[in-house]
């Protein structure tokens, strides 16, 4: 297996090539990429947790240090000014010496406002990529060159195609997240609260709650019907019925995003439904290949949902085709089948059809689908179908011509379990699909 250092060297070569092409297309000399800055809580003297600019961590695995700068031109070795203040109030990260530092020129930046004297004098044709636009203006960057849309669209489009270095990092993130899921299931089985299950997860992954790539969804019982439930009750429920965990990890800035659902008992209808959703998810992944629209797989899973609704007699006296045609599957799976994954959990360019940023929206029937791309080798996506029992979505169906097809008694019996979601992270290759999650034996 190639070392991370050799993979990184090739990764940088790829980023340099993309940068050269972008600069030539948009007639710029270089890009100045800002890691970001700390911002204080309103009327307070402590900052919000720092989140690095994803375009910055695409180049270097520096994710916790504000006030850093990268200058890249696609030709010369990337230059990193690494913030290294004299500070006895806060932790100061040492100047990095790691697998990646041979391929980047690393320079200490002792003062956050000292970058101006270190940059090239002629800056009118440098593009700035970052959050703090006023800082770019102070440095003499032209307003039209601050986050230039064409450049960002171009870079975002090609971020869809992961380098071997990026895939190696994402496989490591998978390992961390899988460890967390196993620890969380054990905590659930022992009767812990959502709050304590979350602590078990973070401990197993080696993350703080500000390190995970998104807020963990730790949902017991009916809380599993809230798609992005992040409350974390401190008290365990009197009766444990179900547990939905949607939680990831991050390695060198790259995310994992996994979901599993467990039934407290193995011999009820809900447990069988969990198994069936899992089986259908795996069956869908087995059909995936390059050259097919991601939208097609979303639509196909609605057909699989219809099959399960009929099997479990949740919808009765209606064909599977009619269920999908009339959107009776919609209230049971109101989100998309998944999304691109990478430096960001909901990674960029899900709707871009080319490197000019041409946008193809989700189908009107499925507005929450986050990707309309044709699958190509190098893409990484989540596949995360679900079935939920959400009253606000079911309520409109309680009246009207289709109400009689809903088995309301069965639905009421399943509502206390909340819902089900099963999520794996897959890589599209030329001749196969790699399931990074199942390769680690996470059931």
From Swiss-Prot:
Gene Ontology BP terms: proteolysis
Residues annotated to bind Mn(2+) 2: 246, 257, 423
GO terms for MF: aminopeptidase activity; metal ion binding; metalloexopeptidase activity; phosphoric triester hydrolase activity; proline dipeptidase activity
Annotated Mn(2+) 1 binding sites: 257, 339, 384, 423
Keyword presence, Protease: yes
InterPro entries, A to Z: Creatin/AminoP/Spt16_N (IPR029149), Creatinase/aminopeptidase-like (IPR036005), PepQ_N (IPR048819), Pept_M24 (IPR000994), Peptidase_M24B_aminopep-P_CS (IPR001131), X-Pro_dipept-like (IPR052433), X_Pro_dipept (IPR022846)
Cofactor: Mn(2+)
SUPFAM superfamilies associated with the record: Creatinase/aminopeptidase
Enzyme Commission number: 3.4.13.9
Chloroplast keyword on record: no
Catalytic activity: Xaa-L-Pro dipeptide + H2O = an L-alpha-amino acid + L-proline
Record's cofactor remark: Binds 2 manganese ions per subunit.
Keywords assigned by UniProt, alphabetized: Dipeptidase, Hydrolase, Manganese, Metal-binding, Metalloprotease, Protease
One matching Pfam family: Peptidase_M24
GO CC terms in record: cytosol
Entry superkingdom: Bacteria
Family (UniProt): Belongs to the peptidase M24B family. Bacterial-type prolidase subfamily.
Annotated function: Splits dipeptides with a prolyl residue in the C-terminal position.
NCBIfam families: PRK13607.1 (NF010133)
UniProt-recorded name of the protein: Xaa-Pro dipeptidase
Lineage: Bacteria, Pseudomonadati, Pseudomonadota, Gammaproteobacteria, Enterobacterales
């Amino acid at each position: 297996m190639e070392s991370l250092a050799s993979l990184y060297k090739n990764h940088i070569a790829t980023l340099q090539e993309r940068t050269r092409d972008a600069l030539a297309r948009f007639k710029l000399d270089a890009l100045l990429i800002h890691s970001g800055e700390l911002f204080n809580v309103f009327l307070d003297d402590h900052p919000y947790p720092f989140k690095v600019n994803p375009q910055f961590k695409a180049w270097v695995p520096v994710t916790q240090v504000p006030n850093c700068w990268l200058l890249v031109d696609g030709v010369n070795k990337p230059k990193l000014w690494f913030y290294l203040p004299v500070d006895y109030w806060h932790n100061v990260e040492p100047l990095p010496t790691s697998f990646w530092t041979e391929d980047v020129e690393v320079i200490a930046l002792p003062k956050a406002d000292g970058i101006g004297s270190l940059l090239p004098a002629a800056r009118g044709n440098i593009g700035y990529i970052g959050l703090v636009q006023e800082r770019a203006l102070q440095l003499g960057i032209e307003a039209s060159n601050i986050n230039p849309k064409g450049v960002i669209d171009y870079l975002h489009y090609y971020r869809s195609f992961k380098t071997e270095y990026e895939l190696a990092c994402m496989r490591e993130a998978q390992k961390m997240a899988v460890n967390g899921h196993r620890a969380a299931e054990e905590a659930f089985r022992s009767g812990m609260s959502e709050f304590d299950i979350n602590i078990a997860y973070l401990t197993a992954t080696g993350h703080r709650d500000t390190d995970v790539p998104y807020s963990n969804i730790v949902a017991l019982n009916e809380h599993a019907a809230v798609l992005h439930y992040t409350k974390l009750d401190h008290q365990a429920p009197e009766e444990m019925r179900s547990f939905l965990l949607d939680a990831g990890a991050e390695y060198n800035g790259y995310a994992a995003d996994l979901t599993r659902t467990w039934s407290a008992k193995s011999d009820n209808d809900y447990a069988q439904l969990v198994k069936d959703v899992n089986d259908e998810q795996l069956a869908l992944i087995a059909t995936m290949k390059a050259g097919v629209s991601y939208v097609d797989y979303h639509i196909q899973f609605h057909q699989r949902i219809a099959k399960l609704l009929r099997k479990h007699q949740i919808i009765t006296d209606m064909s599977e085709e009619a269920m999908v045609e009339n959107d009776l599957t919609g209230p049971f799976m109101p989100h998309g089948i998944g999304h691109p994954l990478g430096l960001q959990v909901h990674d960029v360019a899900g709707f871009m059809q080319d490197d000019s940023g041409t946008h193809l929206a989700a189908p009107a029937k499925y507005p929450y689908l986050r990707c309309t791309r044709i699958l190509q080798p190098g893409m990484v996506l989540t596949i995360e179908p679900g079935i939920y029992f959400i009253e606000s979505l079911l309520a409109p169906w309680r009246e009207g011509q289709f109400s009689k097809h809903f088995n309301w008694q069965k639905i009421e019996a399943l509502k206390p379990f909340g819902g089900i979601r099963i999520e794996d992270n897959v890589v599209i290759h030329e001749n196969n699909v790699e399931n990074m999650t199942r390769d680690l034996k996470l059931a």
